[in-house]
C-alpha cells in the first residue's frame, strides 16, 4: 500500500462523524480595502457555500472560527501583525499600520454575511492561528461524536494549516478542500497543500467531497 492509499484508507470521511470547519472567512480578510485583505478568499465563497448547504442537508455539524485580537489578551500575533492593533481616530489604516483588523468589537471580526452561521452551529472565537489552541473546539467536537474534519477557509498557509496540524495532533482525520481554501500567493497555496498531503491529511476538491458525502 502506497502513501496515497494509506491516507485514503485512514482518512476517508465517516457518515455521522464528519464536521465542516470554516476557518476565518471574516470581513477583515474578505472586504475590499481592509488592511489584511485576502482577495483570493472571495473566490472560494461559492465552494464553501455549496459545502455548507450539503452538510446542513445531511444534518452534519458545522463550525466557524473567527480570529479575534483583544487588547485584554495581547498575544504575539498583535506584535507580529500590527494591523490587529487598534487604529487611532483619524489615523491612516493599511498594511503594516494599526488598523483594528479582527479586533474584538469591530464589525470586521465576523464571518462575511454570505457564509453566516445558522442557529445551533458552533462559532469559535480564537486568539491563535490554530482553532484548537485555547478554545473549546476539541471538547465541542467530541461531544458531537466527530472524528473527521473537512477544512475550508483562509489563510491556507497560516490558520488553515495550523488548524489542520492541531486537529491531526488530536487524532482527528483531516481533509482540506483544495478549492475551498485561499491565501495571497498561488505558489504558497500549492506548497501548503503539498505539505498537508505529505503528512497531515487528504486534499480534495469541493466536488470530490460532495460526491463522497452525497453517497451517504
Language model feature labels by segment:
Residues 1-118, 200, 212-216:
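Active-site acidic carboxylates
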Residues 57-60, 145, 171:
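Glycine-centered short loops/turns at secondary-structure junctions
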Residues 79-83, 168-169, 192-195:
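Short, hinge-like loop/turn segments at secondary-structure boundaries
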Residues 101-150:
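Internal catalytic-core helix/loop-beta-alpha segment
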Residues 124, 202-209:
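Short acidic-hydrophobic, aromatic-tinged amphipathic segments that line or gate anion-handling sites
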Residues 148-154, 171-186:
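A short glycine-rich beta-strand->turn/loop micro-motif centered on a GG-aromatic cluster
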Residues 156-163:
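Short glycine/serine/threonine-rich phosphate/pyrophosphate-binding segments
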Residues 163-165, 183-197:
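Active-site-proximal loop->helix
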